[in-house]
């Protein structure tokens, strides 16, 4: 019965961990462009408001972008911007 006295750890791969921000943004960008929208305006609208209506269902873009939290998307955008524009 020693096995029952120990606390076991259960680990499950979170679906969000397997989703890459870069892939999400590029897929959503392409879907918006194909539908004739201004991708930057639509993505910014979604990030600021949280309203998924800014993102079309085309190419499953709406469900893809909702796999990540908005703050995760914003964090990665800021990191990427600073990485590419920072002078050291």
From Swiss-Prot:
InterPro entries: IreB (IPR009309). It holds the Pfam family IreB. NCBIfam families: PRK05473.1. Belongs to the UPF0297 family. This is UPF0297 protein BC_4382.
């Amino acid at each position: 019965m020693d096995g029952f006295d120990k606390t076991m750890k259960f680990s499950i791969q979170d679906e969000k961990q397997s989703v890459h921000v870069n892939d999400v943004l590029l897929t959503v960008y392409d879907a918006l462009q194909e539908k004739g929208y201004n991708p930057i305006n639509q993505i910014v609208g979604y990030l600021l408001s949280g309203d998924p209506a800014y993102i079309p269902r085309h190419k499953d873009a709406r469900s893809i972008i909702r796999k990540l939290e908005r703050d995760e998307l914003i964090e990665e955008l800021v990191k990427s911007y600073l990485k590419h524009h920072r002078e050291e």
